[in-house]
Amino acid sequence: TGPVRNAVDPSRQAGGSSGGSAVAVALGIGLASLGTDTGGSIRIPAGFNGVVGFKPSYGRVSLEGALPLSRSTDHAGPLTRSVRDAHFLTEILAGESIPLEGVQNPVFGVPLDFLEGRLGVEVRKAFTRLLEDLPALRAEVREVSLPLEGVYEVYTRLVRYEAARIHEKALKEHPEGF
């Protein structure tokens, strides 16, 4: 019982609402796990615990049976130990085959201005190495700009509004559960 501990460093947090799922995969307790992501809850725990977390496009994976937070922004996706396993599990969850060989010369947009000052030294070095390796895989890297001023405020208001509407009754009847 108690809080979930980070699989890499138990003195650190597991990274969010799907942290237990990420830790279970990282420690080999399970081969894969399902997470939900409204604002990073698949990707952040995956990054914190050294596993692969994939947030599929909105609507690709059904949320039937999941307890919603924000119907407009909720996603479900896999946490696995490899990209191949994430691809395979996403196919199962989506109920359709997703061909890998169909991608020719992908282009990666990288918002370097947005990332400036947000990455630690070691993460920045690893990310730079990745960007340098992509052209050898016939991928193009383009610097892009993400004008995100004000987007976060709108996003958080939407999520809070929808969460309040969805959970209003339960919050009134069982506040201790929140």
Identify the meaning behind each predicted range.
Residues 92-178:
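Amidase signature
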Residues 1-90, 97:
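Short glycine/serine-rich loop segments
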